[in-house]
């Protein structure tokens, strides 16, 4: 989900 993307950033 988007949460994972933010974590990656």
Curated annotation (Swiss-Prot):
Q: Could you give a GO molecular-function term held by this entry?
A: toxin activity
UniProt keywords (A-Z) are: Secreted, Toxin
> Which named protein is this?
Short cationic peptide-1g
> What cellular component GO annotations does this protein have?
extracellular region
Instruction: Please state which protein family the record places this protein in.
Output: Belongs to the cationic peptide 04 (cupiennin) family. 03 subfamily.
Instruction: Name where it's found.
Output: Secreted
Please tell me in which tissues this protein is expressed.
Expressed by the venom gland.
Species for this entry: Cupiennius salei (American wandering spider)
């Amino acid at each position: 989900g988007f949460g994972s993307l933010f974590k990656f950033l």
